[in-house]
């Protein structure tokens, strides 16, 4: 880390982290919606992008390459002693979460997806209580209750709201729930690696993405999705440019998140990422005409209020066993 310290003056590090996370994931969100919910072609022969496995495969390849570069230049002294099977097991939930999240966009609009993915404290807390036997402070439960109330308001539709896109009821939300659960399992696995093997963030990023690349590579070959995607890309070559940018912004964003956690801690990182998600929803409403009702705005504010309070007051935990 000494090399990276000398590159950025202390007074500029926080603004750099904030802008890095905000810009990378803001553009990442725009690209994700453009790729997965855009219409390709003209007239009655319009097509949609349905290649979630291939999209995540390319994203994991770029993440792995980026992590390898970071290790080569900034983290050569660290020796990684983490068990290989742990990386392999973690990659299963990691891949499942990303594929489910991207697939959900075929059934729900982007604000719903972002809000759903913002509810990560819920499965993390449930898995912490059930698997790791953690005890959380009352503030944590109240914050999660606020998030649940916000999601309930956002999802509740007493009548059809004009301008809000209809989708297959329930399936997109189930995919988001699956993604959240798998995110929670990934978090538990990563905590275990850090606690028992002191795994560095760059090595974790490299190895989990390498294993994910193997799993997804087998998946896109076995299902034949790779050939369908190549045919789609031949008809609409701009998709390649968008996907490469999507993967690059994801990798850069991850590196800025790790930098924020290392230098300023998880609280600052939570505040930055929560702020970014709110403005991503706002941008989606403005840029992609995803109107949401006043009740849904109230639900959105409650969710982000709960996330902000959780970042500030809900972090204390006591482990009763491991």
From Swiss-Prot:
Membrane topology: Multi-pass membrane protein
Keyword Cell cycle annotated: no
Pfam families attached to this UniProt entry: UAA (PF08449)
Xref: InterPro entries: SCL35B1-4/HUT1
Location relative to the cell: Endoplasmic reticulum membrane
GO cellular component, one term: Golgi membrane
Motif (Di-lysine motif): 318-322
Family of this protein: Belongs to the nucleotide-sugar transporter family. SLC35B subfamily.
Protein name in UniProt: Solute carrier family 35 member B1
Protein's gene: Slc35b1
């Amino acid at each position: 880390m000494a090399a990276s310290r000398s590159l950025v003056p202390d007074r500029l590090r926080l603004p750099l982290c904030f802008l890095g996370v905000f810009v990378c994931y803001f553009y990442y969100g725009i690209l994700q919606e453009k790729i997965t919910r855009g219409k390709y072609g003209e007239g009655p022969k319009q097509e949609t992008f349905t290649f979630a496995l291939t999209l995540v495969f390319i994203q994991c390849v770029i993440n792995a390459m980026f992590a390898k570069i970071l290790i080569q230049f900034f983290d050569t002294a660290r020796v990684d002693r983490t068990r290989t099977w742990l990386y392999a097991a973690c990659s299963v939930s990691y891949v499942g979460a990303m594929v489910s999240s991207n697939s959900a966009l075929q059934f729900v609009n982007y604000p719903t997806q972002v809000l759903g993915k913002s509810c990560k404290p819920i499965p993390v807390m449930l898995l912490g209580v059930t698997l790791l036997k953690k005890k959380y402070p009352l503030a944590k439960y109240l914050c999660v209750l606020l998030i649940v109330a916000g999601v309930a308001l956002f999802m509740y539709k007493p009548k059809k709201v004009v301008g809000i896109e209809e989708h297959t009821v329930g399936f997109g939300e189930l995919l988001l729930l699956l993604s959240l659960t798998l995110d929670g399992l990934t978090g538990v696995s990563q905590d275990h690696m850090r606690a028992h093997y002191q795994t560095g963030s760059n090595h974790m990023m490299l190895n989990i993405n390498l294993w994910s690349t193997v799993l997804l590579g087998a998946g896109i070959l076995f299902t034949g999705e790779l050939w369908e995607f190549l045919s789609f890309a031949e008809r609409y070559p701009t998709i390649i440019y968008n996907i490469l940018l999507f993967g690059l912004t994801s990798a850069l964003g991850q590196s800025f998140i790790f930098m924020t956690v290392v230098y300023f801690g998880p609280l600052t990182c939570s505040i930055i990422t929560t702020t970014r998600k709110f403005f991503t929803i706002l941008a989606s409403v403005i840029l992609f005409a995803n109107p949401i009702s006043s009740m849904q705005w109230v639900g959105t504010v409650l969710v982000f209020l709960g996330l902000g309070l959780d970042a500030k007051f809900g972090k204390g935990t006591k482990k009763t066993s491991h």
